[in-house]
UniProtKB/Swiss-Prot annotation:
C4 is a major histocompatibility complex class-III protein. It comes from the Eukaryota. It is found in: Secreted. Precursor of non-enzymatic components of the classical, lectin and GZMK complement pathways, which consist in a cascade of proteins that leads to phagocytosis and breakdown of pathogens and signaling that strengthens the adaptive immune system. Residues 1588-1735 form the NTR domain. Its main location: secreted. It holds the Pfam family NTR. The record marks 753-754 as: Cleavage. Glycans are attached at residues 224, 664, 743, 1323, 1386. Prior to secretion, the single-chain precursor is enzymatically cleaved by plasminogen (PLG) to yield non-identical chains alpha, beta and gamma. During activation of the complement systems, the alpha chain is cleaved into C4a and C4b by different proteases depending on the complement pathway: C4b stays linked to the beta and gamma chains, while C4a is released in the plasma. The alpha chain is cleaved by C1S to generate C4a and C4b following activation by the classical complement system. This is Complement C4. In absence of complement activation, circulates in blood as a disulfide-linked trimer of an alpha, beta and gamma chain. GO terms for biological process: complement activation; complement activation, classical pathway; inflammatory response; innate immune response; positive regulation of apoptotic cell clearance.
């Protein structure tokens, strides 16, 4: 029996006053906006026949009514009523509730004349105070998957429902917060279907962490609901590893002797077991997650049917603990950490798993006494309720529970003992009789017999006594389900002669009184409650009565078992069916009403990489949201009636008594004290870390102990640590770790041997588990209308995995329902798996190793082949198959050699066929690149038909001697008549690729990130002002807003807590960058919806960087030249100060609220002070062009004094350079260090426009902005805009980010000022003579065209293009030439240098550092017994950080190729750079850089690289500066797919802000490396050499030329275009070619090469993959086809291929021999006849 009671307060009233009539007023303690408020009104003790009329309403005491009135009429026969009081938004606004600053309270008022006339009240009103909340309705947010990679797209849905769980169409506000808690996205939306869907992309630079999507009703700030998702770097696993302990706990009792046992299971995502080896290790983990590894417990076991068992005896465990000086009894509160790495045998893939929740406990059970009341009723039974759970969380049945109850009365005490076993669901109840005199009850409860769990509870009697108590006793202690009838019994306790006739009761659920009723009093009164959906997930039952004028009450919280939704949604597939990838699947959707069903399918492999922590939306989450409206606190009951009402979430008034006003929506939290343990179990390395107390110095120590991927002494590393406080611990710990590693031996006898080694926790990020994925992670993201039933046919993706399909329905009649997910396994009993490299080059040799998996019960023999495709050389031409036998339940790799011969994206298809239906085929795209390195060249011409000299142009073709000889290269020509719409429209800044399409630059740092925002804002502003959005596609406006929001989201990743910004995530803040962000985000306020307070904080930070003289300084500059003028000293300070002034001026727009006016005045004062500084410097006349331009613009923009503006203007104009119709600022006057040689504008219209450096463009753009503000659109502004317009690149941008941002801003302002609706035409004719004859194009354009506003044409690279121009509109013609070159002889390499070397896995000398001799990448066999040198924990787990995968065990000559990259950079001391430089390294084919190595270069205290990016085969390394001395960094790379005859690759080092300053080089694979050897089989090699020349050796064999085969070759087939007799002078290597320089000894024939004569030199090229070698000093007869390239002197050079005749000329001595005399004669006859007569056909 469960006794629930209520106690009335005792008041000293006369008996007559106790029975006076009353009006009782009940209501939920919180009023929710827009939700009807339930109000209970009761008439008590009124005389028979008396009728009471009145009304109830809500009001704000300071203003007036907040709701309409609701009337009531009561009498003794009808003495209670439950009303619904509307709370409209308009009334709440009008009564001023939203303006209340403190907790907004509202009064519920009952008004009736009866109160004053009959109830003797002073007024006609009676009321109670309620808390007002803008929370209303229910919102649910769903994402398409629980975890994402940086750079991935997040798709989400928001479901909006009202208080009754019915669809709501009210406006929603949706926000996204990043892992730093910063809002990065906000939008207001209207969802007519009540389901809003959207998506966004996580910035690729995002740090790991938890993001949040929140949604609320726009008018309800407190209706906020959110969902979280994880962002971390991962790739989907091929198989999942699970760790399952035999017992979910480890007992710390010393006498406990059982073994610690653990099962390891590895299964592919499609359910089949994995073959392989499991490597396991253990650690102790504390409450903060810090791990200390236990040496000696490491194991290496073989998987059998995907499983293995690990057992650790108690003695083994205690021995391991002894090494860290601790005892097993000290471990309670800690956890045993287990980590396992499984390497599968067939493919060598490695997956990992960890177990972090294996606690050390003193008992196998836990005790929960939360359902026991905290109030004692003397004289009544006390019900103790306990729930016993096992440590796994499941209920523990049939467990003995003992209770020792001590009853205290003053100094007397009595002890009662009880014992009982738990029932089937772990529950047990004890009824303890409490005598009337007892004041305190102390309970000691224990569960379990051998090692029991213990809990204590003390309850006390109420401080005062009343007339009696009310007991509520449920008939069944179990929680009811929806549809059940819940029966309760009511009875009085301590009232000998009750005088009341009825019990009154209420049912409260989801913050509303759902029912109010009464029941006649009997000796035992039973009440039945039908539990429907409105009472789920919980409700309070509150009962009360009045006795002697005092209320007696009690309450009980009833939890409803979570079950089904109100409606119905079922997802059905044929679960028994075995689906294959690509199959169609029937998905049945069933509802019980018309509904919208939102679907989604998730790859269950996501849960294996950490997605379990963020579970998908299910009914338990729905119930949780619904239950959040529950206003009650605790299981029910209270010390008195008022407390009973209050804890049930009710407000109550009876005229004399009043419940306390609720201050907030939460319940008071019980304070819990947690006992922390500090056990000294650290190994040597932990002791070293323990020497440092602060987190910063510990981080420095850990960084020092981390091994770099390159050789550096500890002293060299410490010298790079910028902070002195960090340098000492870094150096000390580095030397400590170096000594530990030096003492390691390479021949451990077993994996479990103890090692004095570096603790792995500082080497390993356990979440950094990178594996591969080729397939979508989710699909089926769609919303389907369903009317009770719908059958969908969907096609399954190619993944072999298990899909989990989710469904959420939304119905107008039944609300929201979440279906139970259904799983679909996609599997092939026989399938193959194929890996390809990112890209390869032509004629490199590739080894494919598809892996065949056979899960059938019998062996399978299949034939495997690669399908023939043009551009690939294959075994047998692709028709030759390998017969392979794959045993049952196993896997086997098959090797194929392939040589690509065409540069293209080729579909490579591998087919395996067996008998009957057995077989599989996989097709993937192989990206094949041309040899050499890409070279780009751009040319711009101004088209002006009104200028006679510009009506006809002749554009010469390219004749670069370095172009590869057989590349099919072209010149692309683009013509436009509308510069504004081309640059800022849907083909430029607002193109699908966004501003990224304007520039060919990376976007890694914060300043580069702003390129997403600034030009897009400029474009939007231009189109708004000129009203030209209608000329662009309709979706362009939305796309522009999306681009701006993406840029805003990305830049927030760099924000610091104080509002400032740094160039990198872990870099100190920069004044210049912070000002740049403030300017742009201030302009973007309308689109991004950012809070002004954040930008005000940013402006405040900038004020702190101002010096006394008014200038600004930058503690951590981003760039030193590109934006700050390329200047030193004063100029640099002036440019920075002007830049900050411009930003602060734009930032004034965010100071609109009253609270910010004081800071706004400080900003205005700062601008005035800075302007004085700028005016001083401008007056001195010593500034360079850039500083002058930005100063003039800043002073004009901020409306400084006229004198200052005039001085700056005159100074600037004195530096202007004018040529014809062009005006620009180039060389910087005033500082000799800053003079740049002048680049003139074109002398006449027929010449190309010279391309100026980035600094000139930016300076001129500031000049244009200044002129437009000062003079408007005038002649000078026209000339400046003309020059700037023709500096644009082929893509539409300029040189780098800053010049592009400022120039687009300036040109946009100019184009707005000069916008006209007048239409002008431009007619352009382009003609050229190419290989295929004469080609001509006529273009008719106008200045308002959008669709086809430009034409892009293609011409042969070497062809001359003739241009004729007509019409009356100006235009621009741009040419882009892109081709691959043999060599990169760049003159800038004299000033800027880069060198890349690749070696095999380096064994550094002892002098450098013994640490780096150790090879951490020993392979693992699939059977532990085969290891003579087993893999150690340090080898396995530290080595894992340096690789993405492990290959299967192979023979020694088949081990995967690992190489070490060393990148060295330096510069000439006289070369000035902006500071930031980027090294762009194209990796050798088939290689991938080790990400862990790159992260070490950027993330440790001795940072070597600011940032890195990987893009396909490219690795980009960002350097803050280029040193004047040679500095090198290194990283490892793995060749995941074998490639032979690897060709050289390119590397470029360039100044980011002036990309023309660069150095480009080739580098090659290690010499004598297998990377340079052939992999192909005989017929594949023969195919690959089919295009190679063949040297004729007929003369040596004495074969006579009876058939005239030389003449046939020369004149018939293939009919050559040249014939020379040459002497070879030398051989040289050029990229993927060999070059032979020769001297002509006889000219036999020529076609194009008219200058050919004896004694001239000619170059012959042959592919390096061909076997042909021409020996220096020997003579050869060479005949073939004319080349398309020329050498440096302009002479033709020739490619030697299969259409070339190459024959070594015999020596005179050889021809004198009798055997060769006839053959020599025939050769001489041919030479004479061919040279004199040529071909007679």
């Amino acid at each position: 029996m469960r006794l629930l009671w209520g106690l009335a307060w005792a008041f000293s009233f006369f008996a007559s006053s106790l029975q006076k009539p009353r009006l009782l007023l009940f209501s939920p303690s919180v009023v929710n906006l827009g939700t009807p408020l339930s109000v209970g009104v009761q008439l008590l003790d009124a005389p028979a026949g008396q009728e009471v009329k009145g009304s109830v309403y809500l009001r704000n005491p300071t203003s007036g009514p907040c709701s309409p009135k609701k009337d009531f009429k009561l009498s003794s026969g009808n003495d209670f009523v439950l009303l619904r009081l509307e709370v409209p938004l308009k009334d709440v606004r009008s009564c001023g509730l939203f303006g209340l600053r403190r907790a907004p309270h509202i009064q519920l008022v009952a008004h009736s004349p009866w109160l004053k006339n009959t109830a003797s009240k002073a007024t006609e009103t009676q009321g109670v105070n309620l808390l007002f909340s803008s929370r209303r309705g229910h919102i649910f947010v769903q994402t398409d998957q629980p975890i994402y990679n940086p750079g991935q797209r997040v798709r989400y849905r928001v479901f909006a429902l009202d208080q009754k769980m019915r669809p709501s169409t009210d406006t929603l506000t949706v926000t996204v917060e990043n892992s730093h808690g910063l809002r990065v996205r906000k939008k207001e939306v209207f969802a007519p279907t009540s389901i809003f869907q959207d998506d966004f992309i996580i910035p690729d630079i995002s740090e790991p962490g938890t993001w949040k999507i929140s949604a609320r009703f726009s008018d309800g700030l407190e209706s906020n609901r959110s969902t979280h998702f994880e962002v971390k770097k991962y790739v989907l696993p091929n198989f999942e590893v699970k760790l399952t302990p035999w017992k979910p706990y480890i007992l710390t009792v010393p006498s406990y002797r059982e073994e610690i046992q653990l099962d390891v299971q590895a299964r592919y995502v499609y359910g089949k077991p994995v073959q392989g080896v499991a490597y396991t290790r253990f650690a102790l983990m504390d409450e903060q997650g810090k791990k200390s590894f236990l040496r000696g417990l490491e194991t290496q076991t073989k998987l059998v049917e995907g499983q293995t068992h690990i057992s650790i005896s108690r003695d083994q465990f205690q021995a391991a603990l002894g090494k860290v000086n601790t005892e097993i009894g000290d471990l309670e509160g800690l956890r045993l950490y287990a980590a396992v790495a499984v390497i599968e045998s067939p493919g060598g893939e490695m997956e990992e798993a960890e177990l972090t929740s294996w606690p050390f406990v003193s008992s196998a059970f836990s005790l929960d006494l939360s359902h026991t009341k905290q109030h004692l009723v003397p004289g009544a039974p006390f019900l103790l309720q306990a729930l016993v759970r096992e440590m796994s969380g499941s209920e523990a049945s049939d467990v003995p529970v003992k209770v020792s109850a001590t009853l205290l009365s003053g100094s007397d005490s009595k002890v009662l003992d009880f014992q009982q076993n738990t029932n089937g669901i772990g529950q047990v109840s004890f009824s303890i009789h409490v005598p009337p005199t007892i004041t305190e009850l102390r309970l000691l409860v224990s569960a379990g017999s051998l090692y029991p769990a213990v809990a204590k509870l003390t309850v006390q009697a109420p401080p005062s006594r009343g007339p009696g108590f009310l007991s509520i006793e449920p008939l069944d202690l179990r929680s009811p389900r929806v549809g059940d009838t819940f029966v309760l019994s009511l009875r009085t306790v301590g009232i000998p002669m009750p005088t009341f006739s009825h019990y009154y009761y209420m049912i409260i659920s989801r913050g509303q009184i759902m029912a109010m009723s009464r029941e006649p009093r009997r000796a035992l009164t039973s009440i039945s409650v039908l539990v429907d959906h409105h009472l789920a997930p919980s409700f309070y039952f509150v009962a009360y009565f009045y006795h002697q004028g005092l209320p007696v009450a009690n309450s009980l919280l009833i939890n409803v078992q979570p079950g089904d939704c109100e409606g119905k949604l079922e997802l059905k597939v044929d679960g028994a069916k075995e689906y294959r990838n690509g199959d169609s699947m029937k998905l049945q959707l069933q509802t019980d009403s018309e509904a919208l069903v939102a679907l989604g399918a998730v790859d269950t492999a996501l849960y294996a990489v950490g997605g379990r922590s963020h579970k998908p939306l299910d009914m338990s989450k729905v119930f949780e949201v619904m239950n959040s409206y529950n206003l009650g606190c605790g299981p029910g009951g209270g010390d008195d009636a008022l407390q009973v009402f209050q804890t049930a979430g009710l407000a109550f008034s009876d005229g004399d008594r009043l419940t306390q006003t609720k201050e907030n929506l939460s319940c008071p939290k019980e304070k819990k004290s947690r006992q922390k343990r500090n056990v000294n179990f650290q190994k040597a390395i932990s002791e070293k870390l323990g020497q440092y107390s602060s987190p910063d110095t510990k981080r420095c120590c850990q960084d020092g102990m981390t091994k770099l991927p390159m050789a550096r002494t500890c002293e060299q590393r410490a010298a790079r640590v910028p902070q002195p406080a960090c340098r000492e611990p870094f150096l000390s710990c580095c030397k400590f770790a170096e000594d530990l590693r030096r003492n390691q031996t390479r021949s451990q006898a077993g994996l479990a041997r103890a090692q004095d080694m570096l603790q792995e926790e500082d080497l390993i990020d356990e979440d950094d588990i990178l594996v591969r994925s080729f397939f979508p992670e989710n699909w089926l993201w769609r919303v389907e209308p369903v009317d009770r039933s719908k059958l969908l046919t969907v096609w399954l993706p190619d993944s072999l995995t298990t899909w989990e399909i989710h469904g959420v329905s939304l119905s107008k009649s039944k609300g929201l329902c979440v279906a139970k997910p259904t799983r679909v396994r996609v599997f092939r009993e026989f399938h193959l798996h194929l890996r390809l490299p990112i890209s390869v080059r032509r004629f490199e040799q590739l080894e494919l190793r598809p892996v065949l998996y056979n899960y059938l019960s019998e062996d399978v023999t299949v034939s495997v082949h690669v399908s023939p495709v043009e551009g690939l050389c294959l075994a047998g031409g692709g028709l030759l198959a390998q017969q392979v036998s794959v045993p049952a339940g196993s896997a086997r790799p098959v090797a194929f050699s392939v040589v690509p011969t065409a540069a293209a994206s080729i579909p490579l298809k591998v087919v395996a066929r067996g008998s009957f239906t057995i077989g599989d085929a996989v097709s993937k795209i192989l990206q094949i690149e041309k040899e050499g390195a890409i070279h780009r060249e751009e040319i711009v011409y101004n088209l002006d038909p009104l200028n006679n000299l510009g009506r006809s142009l002749e554009i010469p073709g390219s004749s670069d001697p370095n172009v590869i000889p057989d590349g099919d290269f072209s010149s692309f020509v683009r013509v436009t008549a509308s510069e504004p719409l081309e640059t800022l429209g849907s083909e430029g800044a607002l193109s699908p690729g966004g501003v990224a399409s304007l520039l060919r630059l990376p976007r890694g740092c914060a300043e580069q990130t702003m390129i997403y925002l600034a030009p897009t804002l400029t474009a939007s502003h231009y189109l708004d002002r000129t009203e030209q959005w209608s000329k662009l596609p309709p979706e362009t406006k939305d796309h522009a807003v999306d681009l701006i929001q993406k840029g805003h989201m990305r830049i927030q990743q760099f924000r610091k807590k104080d509002g400032s910004f740094g160039a990198w995530l872990h870099r100190d803040s920069s004044t210049w960058l912070t000002a740049f962000v403030l300017k742009i985000l201030s302009l973007a306020q309308e689109q991004i919806g950012d809070s002004p307070e954040k930008l005000q904080e940013t402006a405040g930070w900038l004020l702190g960087q101002q010096l006394d003289d008014g200038s600004f300084h930058d503690p951590c500059p981003v760039i030193h030249r590109g934006m700050q003028g390329g200047l030193v000293g004063t100029d640099e300070t002036v440019a920075l100060t002007a830049f900050v002034v411009i930003a602060l001026h734009h930032g004034l727009a965010v100071f609109q609220d009253e609270n910010s006016q004081q800071l706004k005045k400080r900003v205005e004062a700062s601008i005035t002070k800075a302007n004085s500084f700028l005016g001083q410097k401008a007056s001195a006349g010593l500034l360079g062009a850039h500083a002058s331009a930005i100063t003039a613009y800043a002073l004009t923009l901020t409306k400084a004094s006229e004198d200052l503006q005039n001085v700056a203007h005159n100074s600037l104009m004195a530096m202007a350079e004018e040529t014809g119709e062009n005006l620009y600022w180039g060389s910087a006057i005033g500082s000799q260090d800053n003079v740049v040689s002048s680049t003139p504008a074109p002398r006449n219209p027929s010449e190309p426009v010279p391309q100026a450096p980035a600094l000139w463009i930016e300076t001129t753009a500031y000049g244009l902005l200044h002129l437009l503000l000062r003079e408007g659109k005038g002649e000078m502004a026209d000339k400046v805009a003309t020059w700037l317009t023709h500096q644009g690149s082929f893509q539409g941008g300029f040189r780098s980010t800053q010049d592009t941002v400022v120039t687009l801003d300036a040109l946009s302002a100019y184009w707005i000022a000069s916008h006209t609706t007048e239409e002008k035409a431009l007619n352009v004719t382009l003609s050229s003579m190419g290989r295929n004859g004469y080609k001509s194009h006529l273009l008719q354009l106008n200045n308002h065209q959008v669709k086809g506003l430009e034409e892009e044409l293609k011409f042969s690279l070497g062809s001359t293009i003739n241009v004729k121009v007509g019409g009356n509109s100006k235009g621009t013609l741009k040419i882009l030439r892109t081709y691959n070159v043999l060599d990169m002889k760049n003159t800038t390499c004299q000033d800027l240098r880069i060198e890349v070397t690749v070696t095999g896995y380096v064994e550094y000398t002892r002098e450098a550092n013994e640490d780096y001799e150790y090879d951490y990448d020993m392979p693992a066999a699939d059977d532990p017994s085969v290891h003579s040198q087993p893999v150690t924990p340090l080898q396995l787990f530290e080595g894992r950080r340096s690789r993405r995968r492990r290959e299967a065990p192979k023979a020694a000559d088949e081990q995967e190729s690992r190489v070490q990259y060393t990148v060295c950079i330096w510069r000439n001391g006289n070369l000035g750079l902006s500071g930031m430089a980027i090294a762009d390294i194209t990796l050798l084919s088939g290689f991938q850089a080790l990400r862990a190595d790159l992260e070490k270069l950027t993330s440790l205290s001795d940072r070597y690289v600011s940032h890195f990016e990987t893009d396909g085969p490219h690795v980009l390394l960002y350097f803050d500066s280029v040193p004047t001395t040679r500095e090198c960094v290194g990283f490892g790379a793995l060749q995941e797919v074998a490639v032979g005859l690897v060709q050289p690759a390119s590397a470029v080092l360039y100044d980011y802000y002036s990309p023309d300053h660069k150095c480009s080089v080739f580098y090659a694979a290690p010499t004598k490396s297998k990377l340079l050897s052939t992999l192909c089989s005989a017929d594949v090699c023969q195919c690959a050499e089919g295009k190679c020349p063949r040297q004729r050796r007929s003369l040596e064999r004495g074969v006579e030329d009876k058939d005239g085969y030389r003449m046939k070759f020369a004149c018939y087939y293939p009919r050559v275009e040249y014939g020379f007799q040459v002497k070879v002078l030398r051989e040289d290597s050029r990229a993927a070619f060999r070059l032979f320089e020769t001297k002509i000894t006889q000219v036999l024939h020529f076609t194009k090469d008219a200058k050919a004569s004896i004694g001239q030199t000619r170059n012959f090229l042959v592919r390096a993959s061909c076997r042909l070698r021409l020996e220096p000093s020997k003579e050869y007869l060479i005949m073939g086809m004319d080349g398309v390239t020329s050498d440096l002197k302009g002479d033709p050079q020739y490619l030697l291929d299969s259409n070339t005749w190459i024959e070594e000329m015999p020596s005179e001595r050889l021809c004198r021999s009798t055997r060769q005399r006839a053959a020599c004669g025939q050769l001489n006859d041919f030479l004479q006849e061919y040279s004199s007569q040529g071909c007679q056909v």
